Design a protein with these regions (language model features):
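Basic/polar, cationic surfaces and motifs that engage anionic cell-wall
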Residues: 94-198, 202-236
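Active-site-adjacent loop/helix surface patches within enzyme catalytic domains
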Residues: 1-119
Length: 236
């Protein structure tokens, strides 16, 4: 009995999905991810000391995303590589991710980008905002993006000008979140909170996570523009 299965015929991963383990120890997480009875698995596990463990072969469909959605795709497990990053998570004492661990995440993701046509690098909370928080607001997404893995908002004046109008119109704002990839059926506040965890973590210091503001919309517009350019580059 295995806790993974073949990918659908002809399907190659185009997404990297990052998680935290949310368990008290690395050993407990590794045991759970390797246990067929758990019905949970990931392709890789990265310890806090930077050690990387291969759990599931990349050509197999691991079971890490659960009920999830991104950009019209509801079978995230089939199109993704799942990476579990050791951290106790919000339940057991959430803490920053050590530099050596982040370095291992970067190296692994860079390798995946060389082997596959990766168009999305996301967190579990992005694809399942209503039930997941990982890898969370302490994860250094900005640093990853600066080193070529994933996207990070780089706003221009036009973004801020448009944000002044859109931030006052929830209907228009919701359409933009859906355009980026979020599930239109997910509660709006959950989507905004997930966006903040990934792309505007500083807002958690103010206690205003989940609230729409002009800066949130400006960042959202920047990401939509970058994603459009990335998709165009991948086609060329």
């Amino acid at each position: 009995m295995l806790n993974h299965e073949p990918r659908p015929k002809g399907v190659s991963p185009y997404m990297i999905l990052l998680h935290y383990t949310g368990m008290e120890t690395m050993e407990a997480a590794k045991e759970r991810l390797s246990d067929p009875e758990s019905k949970v698995s990931a392709h890789y596990l990265i310890d806090e000391d930077g050690s990387v463990f291969d759990i599931v072969p990349e050509d197999r469909r691991a079971w890490h995303a659960g009920v999830s959605y991104w950009d019209h795709e509801a079978d995230i497990n089939s199109v993704s590589i799942g990476v579990e990053i050791v951290n106790p998570g919000h339940e057991f004492g959430y803490r920053p991710f050590p530099d050596v661990q982040m370095g291992a995440v970067l190296k692994l993701c860079q390798g995946l980008q060389e082997r596959f046509d990766i168009t999305h690098v996301l967190g579990h909370s992005d694809v399942a905002p209503e039930r997941k928080q990982d890898p969370g607001e302490l994860f250094n997404w900005k640093w990853l993006a600066q080193n070529g893995v994933g996207l990070w908002p780089e706003t221009i004046e036009e973004d801020h000008e448009r944000a002044v109008v859109v931030a006052r119109n929830d209907f228009e704002a919701e359409k933009l979140f859906v355009k980026l990839g979020y599930n239109p059926m997910t509660a709006y506040i959950d989507v905004v909170t997930a966006f903040h965890r990934h792309y505007y973590p500083a807002i958690f210091e103010t206690g205003r996570q989940g609230e729409i503001c002009e800066e949130t919309i400006a960042r959202l517009l920047s990401l939509i523009r970058q994603q459009k350019q990335l998709s165009s580059d991948m086609r060329d």
